[in-house]
Amino acid sequence: MDQRGGTMSRSASLFQQAAGLIPGGVNSPVRAFKSVGGIPPFIREAAGAMMTDEDGKSYIDYVGSWGPMILGHAPKEVVAAIQQAAVRGCSFGAPTSNEILLAQKLIELVPSLEMVRLVNSGTEATMSALRLARAATGRDAILKFDGCYHGHADSLLVAAGSGLATFGVPSSPGVTRGTAKDTLTVPFNDLAAVEACFAQHPEGIAAVIVEPVAGNMGCVLPRPGYLKGLRDICTKYGTILIFDEVMTGFRVDLRCAQGFYDVTPDLTCLGKVIGGGLPVGAYGGKMELMNQVSPAGPVYQAGTLSGNPLATAAGLATLEAISQPGFYETLTSRTQRLTVGIGKALDEAGIPHVSYHIGSMFGLFFTDAREVYNFADAAKNDHNRFKDWFHCMLEEGVYFAPSPYEAGFVSIAHDEAIIDLTIEKARKVAKTL
């Protein structure tokens, strides 16, 4: 039986089959619908703003593969770039000209980048950036924020958001005490707590790593002055400031969140959008830091598929498309139209909530609170109401993230007609909650 009370025969069968072959039946935990219950639709194909499952049901997609699909699914220019690259070879394990072109484009667009290294995932990017920060400072401790998720490297699975928040665990078995000891955590949006943490660790902190917009606890915005305050504190203590822009990179703005908020970190981590839907990641920053990375320097990092020709081709095509005049104005306007419309629908139904949006990211919290500024606030989300909302919208053919701790995403393929249809469905569902 599925979440709609009927049968989802093909997806149900596939999920059952997958469970005997893949842990939990999925290759990333949140996809299993543990937080909301029911059987996840197995997706057969997608185009534009729409996805179709193995049972033939179509959905307006606001997950966007968890962020990368800023152009929508299967955009012609990206598909063509991948096809043209594939006939020349899928992987060489040797340098290619497209790696240079993608690096040049990233350095051109992202304020903090003077040099960049391509990797295969956001986790690889954050893991490598932290290793570099520790090597450059000679310090061990890192500071992160409750509810911020930076990938599944051991040192970053302490008080993490996203999947760990979804499953209600503060860390993961297998993370050693020694690793956890070197990972310090404080609440997001609390500069006093950051200062206090530095005061308590006179031996010094190697790096502060932060999502400039906390998308892994449901799109929580930084308070005015918060990011600049982090910049000032890190400069004061000789600590490396790392912006994890794997999610916010090119979602908030063409210059990423750092350009939007006019705060320049020492290192930046990227992923998702820069691969156009293919596996990719990157980390970069000041030349003096990046020249410490092997083979230019002693800090080792490598990858068989790093700089993959298909991923770089897809990334270049995507970055070219989003660099066109008016792209972000249109995308931001549509995201605002969606969140304002859903908010009005919930208001009309008398359902307490808080919503946020920035660029093409958005978050919705079912709460009596007037604002959500940290993980403790986000955790007050009414999970039962969220489950009802999720399943009712899914029944209406609208696919939101199956967890209250995940941001939503709008693509340029979500035109006003699709946005308005979503709002109409939200108004219908809100009356039933």
Swiss-Prot record:
The pathway to which it is assigned is: Porphyrin-containing compound metabolism; protoporphyrin-IX biosynthesis; 5-aminolevulinate from L-glutamyl-tRNA(Glu): step 2/2
Subcellular location field? Cytoplasm
**Which GO terms label this protein's molecular function in UniProt?**
glutamate-1-semialdehyde 2,1-aminomutase activity; pyridoxal phosphate binding; transaminase activity
**Primary localization:** cytoplasm
GO cellular-component term (any): cytoplasm
* Enzyme Commission code: 5.4.3.8
What Pfam families does the entry give? Aminotran_3
Q: Name one GO biological process term.
A: protoporphyrinogen IX biosynthetic process
Q: Which reaction does it catalyse?
A: (S)-4-amino-5-oxopentanoate = 5-aminolevulinate
Q: Which family does it belong to?
A: Belongs to the class-III pyridoxal-phosphate-dependent aminotransferase family. HemL subfamily.
Q: What is this protein called?
A: Glutamate-1-semialdehyde 2,1-aminomutase
